[in-house]
């Protein structure tokens, strides 16, 4: 920032680092699982990225698309109401930035564990994908499904999502960017959640022993899901 005082990107990058530091204190669990000291640290730390982002908004346009994403994370932390959060999201839609990470942030905000009601997040995922249409819409549907199912703390009803649409979304992602071990783990994880043993087995065979901690959290969960897939014929 000192070398490039007019750089929006530098400010957004700093805000990203700071808000992650704030969430380290809080964690991603439900509010009643957070200690008083963790809340204190979280509320103290989250103030600075908001201040930095507000300062970045005063710089000459255009705003970096990631600015909106980071501001939505601040909004989640600050408990913004639905109208204020949607205003940020709608500004991105109107600018036609094509930045699907905003969809991920908004879908996460709509989870019941945060500020949405049952069905809000899954309806948003469907509408977003339908608005794009085709393979181009299925791809973000896959990405949003990962967010909703993995961040729902085991309480998100997977049947709200369309497994038949998630799978072509994964294929569209692979076609555009190629496959990754993390993506393979994500599909195996969702196949387990949807109780699709056939797809789960295929992915576990590809994965081998290369389990992704960011997907499964611990090795025991990975082993349990793999054992389940291998023990079922359908």
Spell out what each predicted region is.
Residues 149-202:
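Intrinsically disordered, low-complexity segments enriched in Gly and acidic/Ser/Thr residues
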